[in-house]
């Protein structure tokens, strides 16, 4: 597909926005889903200070800004800020005219209907998109893994979902949502680093801790054993250089933070871990398809990127499932972007071209057209 008419694929996550052109194998733009506003009145006249900053620019000026994430737990909560993010995506990141390209956007499973309508309305009325489609994130991850049946464990920055999919259709009655994801692990890491005497509190410092988490954390296969190893030797310790040049040492925090995915009680949440949630989701499905789900457990999203997570998942699910069951955890190396990749695949299929909602259909039917065309 030529860039001129290529469809745009935009995956709006709670933490990062991934955007690019259908047919590409990776998103061209990946930036934080952040809108920042100045904390103080600008006093330098003629500095050209803006009233808001988006993405990396907001991130780099975080010292003087208040940062807000318009997507909370995977669902858009602030539409004005969301519009700013889309505007930034089209004009600054991809440098395209939105009225010239069909756009495929993604949504969280169990997204409220009103949100889907609002998204459709903004795309057609604010950005004059010629054609539009909205797809469920987990379904796209499954496509990206080359499957049409399986259960997707999609864990990002704001929310985790387990989504069983059969022959390309998500089974809504069996989708489970867990409000425990990357942002909670970052917060927990901030807390346990404070116990070590390092103090992180501001929104700017939280980003440093997020970086520590992404670089140094991993999932232990046996948590108790790992705690024992960490207390008796320094083999698990790693050092990290802060922006000001100070070097800090981090030990058992490396695996204590991600452990919350399997034991949410350590962050004070009364809920099942990701292994139990996956199991419960499978158990809500028809008994005849469970075998296919157990053998196709697909991980997706940035919070599944910890080293060791697939092995731990295999161990935990094996303990829960019937003993004869074949269990396969699929953790593709590009899973951080698999939702976007699935969108890129879908939007470039010739069979998909009749699925778009056109501007004309929108003008005739209004935003509710989205329920008939996208499911």
From Swiss-Prot:
The EC number(s) this enzyme carries: 3.6.4.-
CDD domains referenced in this protein's UniProt entry, alphabetically: ASKHA_NBD_actin
Broad class of the protein's primary localization: cytoplasm
Record's keyword terms, sorted: ATP-binding, Cytoplasm, Cytoskeleton, Hydrolase, Nucleotide-binding
Molecular function GO terms recorded: ATP binding; hydrolase activity
Pfam assignment, any one: Actin
Source domain of life: Eukaryota
InterPro entries associated with the record: Actin (IPR004000), Actin/actin-like_CS (IPR020902), Actin_CS (IPR004001), ATPase_NBD (IPR043129)
Subcellular location: Cytoplasm, Cytoskeleton
Catalyzed reactions: ATP + H2O = ADP + phosphate + H(+)
GO CC, any one term: cytoplasm
Disulfide bonds: none
Keyword Manganese: no
Described function: Actins are highly conserved proteins that are involved in various types of cell motility and are ubiquitously expressed in all eukaryotic cells.
Family as reported in the entry's similarity comment: Belongs to the actin family.
Protein known as: Actin-1
Source species of the chain: Pneumocystis carinii
